[in-house]
Structures are given as structure tokens and as C-alpha cells.
Amino acid sequence: MFSLQELCRKNIYILPYPLGEHVLQQLGLYWKGYGSLQRIGDDHVLLQQDLIFSINEALRMAGEEGNNEVVKLLLLWEGNLHYAIIGALEGDRYDLIHKYYGQIGDCHKILPLIQDPQIFEKCHELSTSCNIRCLLEHAVKHNMLSILQKHKDQIRFHLALTQILFELACHERKNDIIRWIGYSLHIYQLETIFDVAFAHKNLSLYVLGYELLMHKVNTEAANIDLPNLLSYHLRTAAAGGLLHFMFETLKHGGYVDKAVLSAAISYKHRKVVAHFIHQVPRKTVEKLLLHAVQTRAPKKTLNLLLSSLNYSVHPITKQLVRNVVDYRSTLIVKLLLMRRKRKLNLVDAVLARLVRYSTYTDTVKFMGEFSVSPEKVIKMAARESRTFMIEMISKAVWKNHPQTMIHHLKQLADTMKPQSGKDLIIYTIHYIYQSSNLLVAEEEKNIFKLAKFYANHNSVNRFKQICEDYYTLDVDTRFKTLILECFEIAVQKNYPRIATIVDDFIRFLFYKGDITEEEISEAYSLKNAELYVDLKWLQQEEN
């Protein structure tokens, strides 16, 4: 046939009318027994100007008849060869199959198009390299239960094959086949059906799983730990928020406990918690609240648990504080503060634990969330000997300005009660002083005040050092004033070591001629001054 004629046959849609049977036969547009054959659109044919079929249905009919000429024409019209093969199998036209065998490719691709189990099996036989297991697996995939029933005896004697087919049926979600295997054959592991049901949230498959499980329990001496299995299923269902799965499980036993509701909380399924929360003891609810804080549960879940406890959480306050800090979960603190009645302020308790155990970053974040004053945090840090925390917060709050930092820290030291905390703040002040290059004339007044501050707090070594530093500024008159005022402080507050240091500086000033005997005598005339200094040196100088 000429290529032009082939091209016309492939693309002609409207036949010149009328054409005789002989002409149509010559054109290859005639189907014996039906009449003229005409293409309509992209995927239909018209027979004898009357009957309309899809191209693929026409291919199946032609294949069943073994009519290769019509098959070739319909393939030109973009029909699917697989339908011709199906028709040939239905008509036992193996000669036609042989002609196209090289074009078929993988015969397994034809199987989804077949509804008849016998044709299905015949088609599978075209793949000479396949075995019975391959046939049975494809029968499962394409829901050919009758094929499995036909080969039941072969399956029965291969336990591993039974399990393979069962698991395949579960993954393909072929419930009829699953049920047949479950009742007709022995399955040693049922868990796959539940795994697939959970994965696809398929309740009907889950119900079927329990139907088979109970059948197995009642009819076989199966070694099944049913309570443990039920508990596992409840936890899994709760974690997935599958409330109806939980109802189905509870029909067969089991109970909802802390582990089950903890799973629901962890995966944020509040509806599951809401349904069962009133069925568990108060102690369990308290543990669930702690778990909710640990997993940073959303506001609605926390409120649900708090409401169940009537917002009374005093028995677990310490654990709550620990979880808030350890898991950086502060929402519960805010919710308890928002209550008009039964309000519980955990801010100070949480803050104390943060300062003791957590990082500077976590502490500052909490300060911002709850508007905590830096002074409060610094005092807590001083009590816990967190020097780094004091320094970092001071720098952050007071813009790393040395004079401002020292000013505020001095105020805190003045009001700090524990001596260890006071000493740590003073240590921090001196560190800031030393590392900030404040020993300049412009800072003379601030250094003067700082020296008196050290004297007031009996910080002996720092007092001595800052006095030596102050003297280098060449402010002799002011230095003398500082020394005399600090001597008065030492006497009034009973600080003998400060008094001794002052006495040394007074002698130094006297020998330099920067202070007179009268000034010294006046300073040492204070009540009880003789208890702190030895005036003999001055009397010797007079003689």
C-alpha cells in the first residue's frame, strides 16, 4: 500500500458519500460483518454509519475475531495494542498475539485492563519468565479473588507466601482479599493491617484488622499479648488524632491512661485529650500538665488541663517551674497570671531557676516577656554567684556605659542583704572600673565617690588600690579630704583595716607636708579613734 494511501487512512475523518463496498475494501476502510469503518474524533469509530465504539473497544472486538487488517487500521488511529491482545486472548487468537508479541512489552501492564479472571490468568501466562507467586501477587493487586481461591491449596502449604500475599493485600487495601486470607489461611503476623490502617487513616481497614485479630485469638492458640497490643494501638491512634480508631480499640478492651493521652498532647490532638480527660484521676491530669509544658503544648490544650484541675496546681508547682525552665516553655506562666481568681505568680520562682541554671540569653528573653526589672535579676545573680550574668545584664541594660553601670550597681550593693551577694556586686563594680580606663581627671569626682563606697562597705583591698589610683590624679586637697572622710567612716563603722590604710596615707601626706598636725589631731580626736591608730608617731614628730 502506498504511503500516501496509508497517510489518508490514518487521518481521514469524513468519508466521501456514497462509496461502494468494493471501494471501501480497497481503501481498507471496511470491516467484514459490520460494514464501513470511519474514525470519529480522536478516540471513537463509526461502523456502517450507525454504531459508535471507542477505538479500544473496537480493537478488542477485532482482536477477538483475529482480524489483523482492522487491528492494523485501528492502531493507525492511535488505539492501544493491549486491547487487541485482550480480545485475542478472549477468542484464543494466539496467531494474532504471536504477530504483535514483540510490541507488547511487559504483559503485566495489560492486567489492570482485564476484568475476567480467566483472561487475566491467560494474559499472565504470556510472560514465560513468571511463576505462580507472580500471578498471585498481581491477582491481589488487581482484586482477582477468584484466582486466589483457585490456587488456595498451593498457597496454604507455603506459610511465607501466605504472609506475603496478606501484607500485599493490606498495602493495596483490598479488604475482600484480606478478609478471605484471614479466615481461610493461617497468618502468623497481623500487625501490617494495623500499620497500613494508621498510615492511611483507613477506619474500615482498622475495623477489619480487629475482626481478624479476634478471630485469631478465639480460634488459634496464638501467643498474642492482647493488653499490650491494645495499649500500643491506643497510643498510636492518640498520636494521630484518630478518635474513632480509639473507640474501635476500646470495644475490645484496653484503657486510656497517661501514656495514651501524653501521645495525644505530644502531637497536639486536643480533641482526643478533651474526650478522655475526665476519665482519668487528678494525679494523672497533673502529670499530663507537666508533660504539656515539656512539649510546649498550645494554649487551648494547657487551658483544658488547667480547667480540669480547676487551676489549682500547687502540688506540682516545683515540677512546673523546673519544666518551664528546662524546656523554655513559658506559656503556662502567662496563663496562670491571667486568672482573676486562683492567680498563681510563678515569675519569681522561674526567674530564680533561670538565673541559677540557664543561660544569659534565656534569662534576658524571660525578662522581656514578663517585664522583669534588671535590678531584680542582678540581685538574684549575685546570690547565685553568677558573675557573668551580672556583667552581661549590666552591659545590655545600661548600654555598656561604665559610669552608669557603676552607679546602678552601687545602689544595688547598698540594698543587698546577703554579704556574699554584696561582695560579688562590688567585685563586678571594680572589674568595670579597672577595664574601663576611668582613671582620668574628668572622672575625679566619680573615683572619689567610688573610694568612699569601698570604705563604706569595708572592701579593704579595693579601697587601698583606688586610693593609690586617686592620688596619681594630682588632686592633693581632694585626696586629703577623701582620706579624712574615710577615716571617719572607718571609726564609725568599726572597720579597723580601713582605718589602718587611712593612717598610712595620713602619715604619707604628713611627711610630704600636705597635711598639718592640727588637721591630723582633729581627725584623730574622734571618739574611739585611739582604738584604730597609734598616735605615738605624731607625738614623736612633735618632739
From Swiss-Prot:
Per UniProt, which keywords does this protein have? Answer: Early protein
UniProt KW Ribonucleoprotein keyword: no
Q: Which Pfam families match?
A: DUF249 (PF03158)
Induction (UniProt) = Expressed in the early phase of the viral replicative cycle.
Under InterPro entries, the record lists: MGF_505
Q: Where is the signal peptide?
A: none
Q: What does this protein do?
A: Plays a role in virus cell tropism, and may be required for efficient virus replication in macrophages.
Give the family from UniProt: Belongs to the asfivirus MGF 505 family.
The identity of this protein, by name, is Protein MGF 505-10R
**Organism for this UniProt entry:** African swine fever virus (isolate Tick/Malawi/Lil 20-1/1983)
